[in-house]
């Protein structure tokens, strides 16, 4: 069973109609857990076209997407690794005025919002912004990215997303990379675990992402802020150590990037969560 199949199963959708294969019918698109300009150029174009014809875009990610951030009605950055917490907050917000089973109601009442907000960087203000944009929407599309499927807490993330679509009448799900025949109904799991240890990625972080051009396989691309944090020079040959493995790369400063996460293009997607705390040193010539 692939990661994607497991994730779709954990969404626990009671009705196939809750799945969407296109963004076209949505009046609000909420994208989370993907960098479309890198991971899915077709999706990025489709979202851009929707926004140009009046759809509102909410974009939540660990960094800005050069194509989508400027098109967003609201963009907010969450901390690497905190996706489960972000979904707990979104689910609580979306289901606030919905009649829920007692067990779920209690779960959301007891959710430690202070802790989750502090660790994820998505607080009350961000949730209020999202609520304001969604308040009059008749069709909200929740775009679930590949980061969510490879996350150690993928099952519970899918459970939260699934709860939203099963209980909120105006939300449908778009699973990035899924084909029509991947989308299946399943029994919902409505027993949630407490969120009490959101991981922290302290230090220099790299994001392994697909290559857009073949030449990128040798590069590590980062913003001016990343360059300062990692103490590297533009066009310098460096060794990037991730879990004891050393990758020789050339650092390239990219002024279109923001934040302190560098992009590490790879030729094939791996099934592990794509963020890594890395050690970066200048390579011996």
List PLM regions with ranges.
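Glycine-rich oxoanion-binding loops at beta->alpha junctions
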Residues: 2-23
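A short acidic, often aromatic-flanked loop/helix-cap motif at beta-alpha or helix-coil junctions
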Residues: 2-5, 80-87, 180-183, 257
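Short, basic, glycine/proline-bearing loop/turn elements
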Residues: 3-6, 29-34, 114-115
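A conditional alpha-helix N-cap/helix-loop micro-motif detector
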Residues: 12, 40, 123-124
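Amphipathic coiled-coil/heptad-repeat helices and related helical stalk/stem segments
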Residues: 15, 43, 126-127
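A cross-kingdom feature strongest in bacterial/archaeal respiratory oxidoreductases
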Residues: 18-31, 35-71, 143, 150-285
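Long, well-ordered, tryptophan-enriched scaffold segments
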Residues: 51-138
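A structured phosphate/pyrophosphate-recognition subdomain
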Residues: 138-145
